[in-house]
A protein has these predicted regions:
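Domain-scale detector for complete catalytic domains at protein termini or as standalone homologs
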Residues: 1-91, 95-258
Length: 258
């Protein structure tokens, strides 16, 4: 599969000049663009999938990861800007949902849709005791306690975990330091996606994303925990395709904060 991109921050595994829309996928903390690789054929040819690629992982492994969520979002928005010549949506998972939200606020064009997966809304993220500063063994124990979707084979591979450690630590630091700032509501519909048994994004917190958009906001739940999306991918792909290839409903009354 050939990757074409004008920026290291956005991978375009399959460029589709005739696509009706684009989907920008933002991975979870510590994750790379390959976590969304199976979405590329799943949405073609109607939707071109663009993968957000943060430094410090996969082919950018030798680059220093960033520990500032707003700075990350600014880089993502800058890389997206040349690709907004047709309807587009963002889909972020876990910390990626917060990055996607912050990037959407900076874009020169409004998204057609935002999909927020496995994340409480940014204004209601509960502060947890910080762990990013802990010694390696303690930090990784906390990561393993939090994440239910990383295979044992990965945890048990000391060399692989050593490669992943800097980006994991930077992402946890970015999330721990992030504080939401009141902003204009997103001018587009938002679909919130969650796992019914996700302890990191409790079901009761998800509907509060509605306060961050002037459009319609709906919440959809799936069986599973924090990485429910691995099994629910086909259903969510259908939702994305429908949202990007059918006319959007009229905006609802503004529900913004601030």
């Amino acid at each position: 599969m050939t990757t074409t991109t004008a920026s290291p921050w956005i991978k375009r595994p399959r460029v589709l000049p005739e696509a009706r829309a684009r989907l920008f996928c933002v991975p979870h903390g510590g994750g790379g663009p390959s976590s969304f690789a199976r979405w590329v054929p799943g949405l073609a040819p109607e939707v071109e999938v663009c993968l957000v690629h943060l430094p410090g992982r996969e082919s950018r492994l030798r680059e220093e990861p960033l520990a500032d969520l707003r700075l990350i979002a600014a880089h993502v928005a800058e890389a997206m800007a040349p690709l907004l010549d047709r309807p587009f949506a963002l889909l972020g998972h876990s910390m990626g949902a917060i990055i996607g939200y912050e990037a959407a606020l900076l874009l020169p064009a409004a998204p057609s849709h935002v999909f927020a997966s496995a994340s409480p809304p940014p204004h209601s993220v509960e502060e947890e005791p910080p762990v990013a500063h802990l010694p390696d063994a303690e930090f990784l124990a906390e990561v393993r306690r939090s994440y239910d979707g990383i295979p044992d084979a990965v945890w048990n591979d000391a060399d692989l975990m050593a490669l992943m450690l800097p980006s994991l630590r930077a992402d946890f630091a970015a999330y721990e330091e992030y504080r939401w700032r009141p902003s204009e509501p997103l001018p587009c519909p938002v679909t919130v996606l969650g796992g019914k048994d996700d302890p990191l994004a409790p079901v009761g917190t998800l509907s509060d994303w509605s306060r961050l958009t002037s459009g319609i906001c709906r919440t959809l739940l799936f069986d599973g925990g924090h990485f429910y999306l691995n099994e629910a991918r086909p259903q969510v792909q259908d939702l994305v395709r429908e949202a990007l290839t059918t006319p959007a409903p009229a905006p609802a009354e503004t529900k913004g904060l601030g």
